[in-house]
């Protein structure tokens, strides 16, 4: 609905902004912060790829390492020797610590670097060691950072073979989250949760966070410090924006694409990375997200006076109920399927009374739930297909 409204109102009066506009502002100094623990063979390649492909000159990369992780330090040292704008930061405490603790050490090193170089960064960007950064990302941040305090771009996981079901669930989730949920959240509530990667903070925002935490910007007790920061900045009246900005010219419009893949969506300035591919790793990561957002978030961020923002807070926190209910529903479904198989395979089997017969209200409720489920499936297929093509869209079912 929002897209249709903008197409009928905004884009009829104003042409879509071209990516060439991003080249007009002077390049402001930007700092990229990358925490790294046990990232041997990864962080060096990431920093080198960024240093050689970013379409921007006035930036520095600060990689946070640990004193008890010499292999990662060695990787970073090799890149630092080749690129003077890549810097190694060694945290005060041995690892592993929380991501927030590492980022606080990196931010402290950036402050010292600013004093010694006698200049100030205009923006501070979060990335992980696995990220592939879009060449135009810094130009987009440079264009917006004077007017916005938190800028978030989409995250689109890399594809794997279709048999990698665990990893592929991230494709489904992020396609919907950053294609639908967060844009609507920003439009209605003006609040954008940071994804922890592809996030740029203005100098105003970082200064406010440092003042709020007595010199410590990121909450080291939080398992989801990125989610936490979005609310802290909103409470301070800072402006937050989620940006879906495509880099499309006439040549790219004519390029051969996957079936039903959208030209503008598939050429979005975004963050690409591989997500966990094993069940145990994915459970550990998603458990951290659930605990941080649902339980720690409920304790830290109270309900507000805004009904709209409270609605999105409820959507964040309903996982405390829905995750358990979904698990119980799955057990019930397995039980019903086993009973159905038992009654079908053995003619003389005991036939249990069905819970689905004799109630018009129950049947109506089941059909209503079925309709809602189909609606959710269709939405997921649409948003996955827009970036990845129809094959991935159908696999999301």
Model-derived regions, located:
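Interfacial transmembrane-helix starts/ends
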Residues: 125, 197, 291, 316-317
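Membrane-embedded multi-pass helical conduit in multi-pass membrane proteins
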Residues: 318-397
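Loop-to-transmembrane boundary segments
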Residues: 25-35, 41-42, 307-329
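Internal catalytic domains of large membrane-associated glycosyltransferases
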Residues: 4-284
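Membrane-proximal soluble regions of multi-pass membrane proteins
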Residues: 268, 272, 276-301, 392-397
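Pan-eukaryotic secretory-pathway lumenal catalytic ectodomains of glycan-active enzymes
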Residues: 295-305, 309-312, 319, 343
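Transmembrane-cytosolic junction motif
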Residues: 1-15, 383-392
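P-loop NTPase catalytic cores that bind/hydrolyze ATP
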Residues: 225-244, 282-294, 318-336
């Amino acid at each position: 609905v929002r897209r249709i409204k903008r197409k009928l109102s905004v884009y009829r009066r104003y042409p879509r902004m071209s990516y060439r506009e991003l080249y007009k502002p002077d390049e402001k100094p930007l700092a990229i912060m990358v925490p790294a623990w046990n990232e041997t063979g990864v962080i060096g390649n990431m920093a080198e790829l960024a240093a050689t492909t970013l379409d921007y000159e006035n930036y520095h990369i600060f990689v946070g390492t640990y004193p008890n992780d010499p292999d990662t330090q060695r990787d970073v040292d090799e890149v630092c020797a080749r690129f003077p704008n890549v810097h190694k930061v060694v945290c005060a405490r041995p690892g592993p610590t929380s991501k927030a603790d590492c980022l606080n050490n990196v931010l402290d090193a950036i402050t010292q670097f600013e004093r010694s170089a006698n200049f100030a960064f205009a923006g501070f960007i979060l990335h992980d060691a696995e990220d592939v950064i879009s060449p135009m990302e810094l130009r987009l941040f440079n264009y917006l950072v004077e007017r916005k305090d938190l800028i978030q771009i989409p995250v689109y996981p890399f594809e794997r073979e279709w048999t990698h079901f665990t990893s592929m669930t991230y494709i489904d989730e992020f396609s919907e989250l950053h294609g639908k949920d967060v844009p609507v959240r920003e439009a209605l509530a003006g609040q954008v949760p940071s994804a922890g990667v592809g996030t740029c903070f203005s100098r105003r925002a970082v200064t406010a966070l440092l003042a709020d935490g007595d010199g410590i910007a990121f909450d080291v007790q939080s398992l989801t410090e990125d989610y936490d920061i979005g609310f802290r900045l909103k409470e301070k009246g800072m402006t937050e924006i989620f940006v879906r900005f495509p880099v499309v010219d006439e040549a790219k419009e004519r390029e051969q694409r996957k079936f039903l893949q959208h030209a503008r969506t598939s050429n979005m300035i975004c963050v690409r990375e591989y997500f966990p591919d094993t069940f145990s790793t994915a459970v550990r990561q998603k458990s951290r997200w659930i605990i941080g957002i649902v339980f720690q978030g409920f304790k830290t961020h109270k309900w507000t006076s805004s009904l709209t923002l409270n609605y999105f807070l409820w959507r964040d926190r309903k996982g405390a109920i829905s995750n358990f209910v979904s698990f119980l529903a799955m057990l019930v479904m397995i039980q019903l399927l086993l009973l159905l198989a038992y009654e079908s395979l053995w003619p003389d089997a005991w036939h249990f009374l069905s819970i689905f017969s004799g109630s018009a209200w129950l049947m109506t409720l089941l059909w209503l739930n079925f309709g809602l489920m189909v609606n959710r499936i269709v939405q997921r297929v649409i948003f996955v297909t827009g970036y990845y093509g129809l094959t991935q869209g159908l696999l999301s079912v």
